[in-house]
Amino acid sequence: MADQLIISSFSEPPVGQIPSMQVEITTRCNFDCFYCAGRDMPQQDMDYQAFSGLLDYHLSQYGVPPVVSLQGEGEPTLHQDFFRMATRVKDVGSRPFTITNGTYKQWQKFIPLFDFIGVSMDTLSPEEAKKIGRYNLPRVQDFIEKLATHMPVTVYTVLLSSGAKAVAQWCHERGIRQIVQPLQGKPDYQYRYPQFIPRFIQKEDFSCVYLHQNLMRYYDLNGREMPCCFIKDTKQYPGLQEMKRMQEISQRPACCTGCLMTG
């Protein structure tokens, strides 16, 4: 129902036993969303050869991932090799996925390469969108509607105000799936939105669904491998094997403090 919001912190499609792959191919963006950690990162792209090497590494370590998500803290379609990367993913037998802001004009280029995609849209109000740092709302809506006639589209909405319900109604009327995502509670996100700090009590014992179920591997712009896409302050990242060891003794890594996805 349109008045019932699906709340989720996941940004990936469902996965199988082999972990999916998410690659931060760019930190550049044509939006300036106040909640985005990427706006304070160095603005740059991942080299195509580096991406191809990471894909080969993942294949050798884990096998063919069910999904390779081309996204991080930037707008993926700004990368000049975005569709080339998607083609490479298909060539190895996987399925490319992305979450785009929907401003790319040549929407038809997605059809032969993608089985499904995500589009971010937080509000239907141009005024509210501008306050958030989002633009070209009519173009985004047109992008969603046109592409939804060719493939499943999921609209991702950050839970900021009542605008999420208006987006839910808009999606419901068009038969489009929507996922509403809360703001992250981690310090490496929170500094950008102190007025919206999520209120929740975190358990002392540490458990992480990404580590338990081996859901995915996230590769940031520098090629660093992590178990999820929520670790932005990599100085505190102890490494994948150390995180698994810490989980076994219910010890929370510093890089996971405040994370909504951990117990």
Predicted regions and their residues:
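Conserved alpha-helical substructure of the radical SAM core
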Residues: 1-116
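Short, intrinsically disordered/low-complexity patches at protein termini
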Residues: 101-103, 243, 249-252
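Short cysteine clusters
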Residues: 29, 33-36, 208, 228-229, ...
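Radical SAM enzyme [4Fe-4S]-AdoMet core and its adjacent flexible, acidic
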Residues: 13, 24, 39, 44-49, ...
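Cysteine/selenocysteine-centered motifs that mediate thiol-based redox chemistry or coordinate metal-sulfur cofactors
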Residues: 247-263
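Sequence-level motif detector for i,i+2 pairs with an aromatic at +2
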Residues: 16-20, 124, 254
